[in-house]
Curated annotation (Swiss-Prot):
One of its GO terms (molecular function) is CTP synthase activity. It catalyses: UTP + L-glutamine + ATP + H2O = CTP + L-glutamate + ADP + phosphate + 2 H(+); L-glutamine + H2O = L-glutamate + NH4(+); UTP + NH4(+) + ATP = CTP + ADP + phosphate + 2 H(+). The lineage of its organism: Bacteria, Pseudomonadati, Chlorobiota, Chlorobiia, Chlorobiales. NCBIfam families: PRK05380.1, PyrG. CTP binds at S18, D153, I154, E155, K193, T194, K195, P196, T197, Q198, K229. CTPSs have evolved a hybrid strategy for distinguishing between UTP and CTP. The overlapping regions of the product feedback inhibitory and substrate sites recognize a common feature in both compounds, the triphosphate moiety. To differentiate isosteric substrate and product pyrimidine rings, an additional pocket far from the expected kinase/ligase catalytic site, specifically recognizes the cytosine and ribose portions of the product inhibitor. UTP binds at S18, K193, T194, K195, P196, T197, Q198, K229. This is CTP synthase. The active site is at C390, H516, E518. L-glutamine binds at Y59, G363, L391, G392, M393, Q394, E414, R471. Pfam families: CTP_synth_N, GATase. Residues 1-272 are annotated as: Amidoligase domain. Belongs to the CTP synthase family. Catalyzes the ATP-dependent amination of UTP to CTP with either L-glutamine or ammonia as the source of nitrogen. Regulates intracellular CTP levels through interactions with the four ribonucleotide triphosphates.
């Protein structure tokens, strides 16, 4: 198989409306090209002026996805990693804020030799230089770049201009544009409407870019007639109009695009030849397990502060899909708003109806903390499988200190700087940090597991590496007391100073971690902790069903019992 001499660039843009799924499209195409033997990477360009999403509200941006090298990035990078099973990095996410910051820093250093710094050429040249960063080391065949925003947005124009110039410089055989649009279905007319797509392409043409391939999102499949009409009015061949209708799971998208031959159209246009046929049997089996689990459904409660906006917990939800497939069940997530438990009229028994496990999610700030602590207490006292992540571990520590160690005023100094029993405290190296952005303990760090612990059993090894995003840690002054009361510190930093994992031996599953395991769960590599947690929740659910069944069976009299013998 002959490698291309130059890295091939694929740019994915979106039109008509936002949230069409450019990230899923990019990840799916990347997976298809990788399955053919090509070396693929994906990057995301966001048009906002923030340097990174690290300080942005989860309500506005969703979760912050942390890479191994400590970059705080867009949640779409999570899709890239889950679909490609390849790590991303700081270079995989560029914001317009970082571009402007770099240009201004260069101006301050005098690198522009007294010239007037302008969007064209200086900002555009900076973007083009960044576009090639991932391609410089010679380890790639294809680089896919997702351009955030919607065609027509002012913010995206510099990215589009850089893309236009790059295509002019490198040629059609090296740069390709895929434009994702929306074809709405009008129920009153019982037909799909192509006019929004036509207008979106018209706006893209106004920037000097002719799309090479159109991918049309729709509620229903596109007929050949519709594809022909779209192609005719948008100046692309009918075979370059790809249908992408709604499906049960996002993991079915690569299979749909394979049937539509998107990967073949891309390879032909970029002159990529003699690559192997894709083998996606493993992916098909996974999708079958997701859509038709043989052991039914279980419900897991996710207690958080941002439950109105599920994208704030995107990687957690996806990790449950992976773990559900691994355990032959569908995991239905029930969002539990932490603040609700702080109301005196709140019924905890009702909140846990039908729930077979509790995950207390990450977050920042004191809002809803007391509610989270109450949820942890209920799960611990009722032997319900429990899993805490980051802030969830800190809440589990506070709850254990108050209700088991008899430290009623236990708290974190994040919520009460004068806490009498600060079982969670600011990390020593964080105490002189003043700025918010990019200053936490970020990225991948090693952790040593305790032999014989639950986590050692599920990981099957002693040394692990997990991704972190936190400023506060367990206060070691309380370790001895916790251990005396039954808490196991089953994971620590290699020097033993930083507590990474806690668990309870006598509980069916009570594990809490300081890191973010959801960020490393993959389709073919379900994260061991999610796998173990879902398995415990499944066993708990089956036990409850068995008890319910026994209660519903008619009770036989002693005479009937003797007769049955």
């Amino acid at each position: 198989m002959a490698r291309p001499k130059n890295v091939k660039h694929i740019f994915v843009t979106g039109g008509v409306i936002s949230s069409l799924g450019k990230g899923i499209l990019s990840a799916s195409l990347g997976m298809l090209l990788k399955s053919r033997g090509l070396r693929v990477a994906i990057q995301k360009y966001d048009p906002y002026i923030n340097v990174d999403p690290g300080t942005m509200s989860p309500y506005q941006h969703g979760e912050v996805y942390v890479t191994d090298d400590g970059a705080e990035t867009d949640l779409d990078l999570g899709h890239y990693e889950r679909f490609l099973d390849e790590p991303t990095s700081q270079a995989s996410n560029l914001t317009m804020g970082r571009v402007y910051k770099s240009v201004i820093d260069k101006e301050r250093r005098g690198e522009y030799l007294g010239g007037t710094v302008q969007v064209v050429p200086h900002v555009i040249d900076e973007i083009k230089e960044k576009m090639n960063d991932l391609a410089k080391n010679g380890s790639l065949d294809v680089l896919i770049t997702e351009i955030g925003g919607t065609i027509g947005d002012i913010e995206s124009l510099p990215f589009l201009e850089a893309m236009r110039q790059l295509k002019l410089e490198l040629g059609d055989r090296n740069v390709l544009n895929i434009h994702l649009t929306f074809v709405p279905y009008i129920k009153a007319a019982s037909e799909l409407k192509t006019k929004p797509t036509q207008h979106s392409v018209k706006m893209l043409l106004e920037t000097g870019i002719q799309p090479d391939i159109l991918v049309c999102r729709s509620e229903k499949p596109l007929s050949r007639e519709i594809k022909n009409k779209v192609g005719h009015f948008c100046n692309v061949h009918e075979q370059d109009v790809i249908g992408l209708n709604d499906c049960e799971t996002i993991y079915a998208v690569p299979l749909m695009l394979l049937r539509e031959q998107l990967d073949l159209r891309v390879m032909k246009k970029l002159g990529l030849k003699k690559f192997r046929e894709p083998n996606l049997e493993h992916w098909k089996r996974f999708c079958e397990k997701v859509t038709n689990p043989k052991d039914g459904e279980i419900t897991i409660g996710v207690c958080g502060k941002y439950t109105e906006y599920p994208d704030a917990y995107k990687s957690i939800i996806e990790a449950f899909i992976h773990a559900g497939a691994s355990n032959d069940v569908k995991v239905s997530v029930k969002m539990l708003r932490a603040e609700d438990a702080e109301d005196s009229s709140f019924n905890m028994n009702k909140a846990f109806e039908g729930v077979s496990g509790l995950l207390v999610a990450p977050g920042f700030g004191d809002r809803g903390i007391e509610g989270k602590v109450q949820f942890v207490q209920y799960a611990r006292e009722n032997n319900i499988p429990f899993f805490g992540i980051c802030l969830g571990m800190q809440c589990a520590s506070i709850e254990f200190a108050r209700n088991v160690c008899d430290l009623p005023d236990a708290n974190s100094t994040e919520f009460n700087k004068r806490a009498r029993f600060p079982v969670i405290d600011l990390m020593e190296q964080q105490k002189k940090v003043k700025e918010k952005g990019g200053t936490m303990r970020l990225g991948s760090y090693p952790c040593i597991l305790k032999e014989g612990s639950k986590v050692h059993e599920v990981y099957g090894k002693f040394l692990i590496n997990e991704r972190h995003r936190h400023r506060y840690e367990f206060n070691n002054q309380f370790r001895k007391l916790f251990e005396e009361k039954g808490m196991i510190f089953s994971g620590t930093s290699p020097n033993g100073e930083l507590v990474e994992i806690i668990e309870l031996k006598e509980h069916r599953w009570f594990v809490a971690v300081q890191f973010h395991p959801e960020l490393k769960s993959r389709v073919q590599k379900v994260h061991p902790l999610f796998d173990g947690f879902v398995q415990a929740a499944k066993e708990f659910a089956m036990g409850k069903r068995q008890l319910t069944l026994e209660d519903e069976l008619p009770r036989l009299s002693s005479e009937e019992m003797e007769g049955a013998g």
